[in-house]
Each structure stands twice: as structure tokens, then as C-alpha cells.
């Protein structure tokens, strides 16, 4: 869906806030060129086009933070597991991956021009071939969920969190983000080739 948004930007057929929504994906992209397939009609697969006027190149990570918070808040409206953000782009529910995020930023000079925000949430899929450690809202809740309903909640949560970003309340964003960060309760150290926690 991110590639489709890029095509629409090039042809000037997209506006800030527009969404590209796919029913299924067979060439989903993640970090480090990882790919995956999604069952038809089972998951929420979108890309959102947004402009962030006034944000600098150095502040681009805050987009990742607010999107991660938006996704996790949406998932928490359906499942009560321990839900965490696994830096940089995964959302975990009960130690299993339930969502992935891929954000591609367009930078000009030191200014952030726009972002393509790709989000995949496992909603009703129950079998994940060749993907160990994956889960979905349905697997956790035992309920079939209307995907359009998940989309509406997600967009509402994105708008709320982006409003915090627009007013540059970076402290609030970081406090919220750190409260949901996976592994925040321990640190690992390497001393003389030995790992300590």
C-alpha cells in the first residue's frame, strides 16, 4: 500500500489524510526488506498519507512514536493482553506480534515534507504460515471483528495522537511511548563478552 501511495503522490492524485486500504497483501514490506503475505479480507492493511509542516528531520522519530501509540490504543480496545511497542515498528500482544508499522518519510533539506504511514493489524487471521510468534485480535478475543470498525477507531486514534505532535508536546509523547515500550523494565549489558540483565 505504501508503493501505491507513492504512485498517487507522483501523479498528484492524493491529498494529506487520504488512505489506501488493501483487502490482502502478497508483497508486504517490513524492516530490513522482510516480506509477508496476508490472508484475503482478514486483516487491516492501510497506508496513510500525511504532511507534517514545521517538523524537522531530527523530529521524524516522533511520527513513529505517535503512530505506534495509536495502533496500540486501537488494539487495546479489543484485547486486554499485555500490549507493548517493540522498537522500531512492531506491536506485541501477549509476547506475539499483532501489528507492524512501516513509515517512509520524505525529507527536503532539514524539513520533513510528508510521510507515508503503512500499518498492518492482524484482525481475523488465525493461521500464519511461515510466521512464528504471530497472533491476531480474533485469536486472542475469540471474536470475529469488523475490519472497517477497526479502521475507524485507528484513524480516530491517529488523529488524536497527531494533534499532540502538532502542538509539539514531545514530553507527553515520550511519557506515553515509554510506558508502552517492550523491555523497558530491564537493561542488558555486555561486560567481558558476558551478557548481564
Regions found by a protein language model. Name each.
Residues 1-78, 144:
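N-terminal lobe of the biotin/lipoate ligase/transferase fold
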Residues 22, 83-87:
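General beta-strand structural signal in soluble alpha/beta enzymes
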Residues 53-83, 93-197:
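Long, positively charged amphipathic alpha-helical accessory segments at protein N-termini or as interdomain linkers
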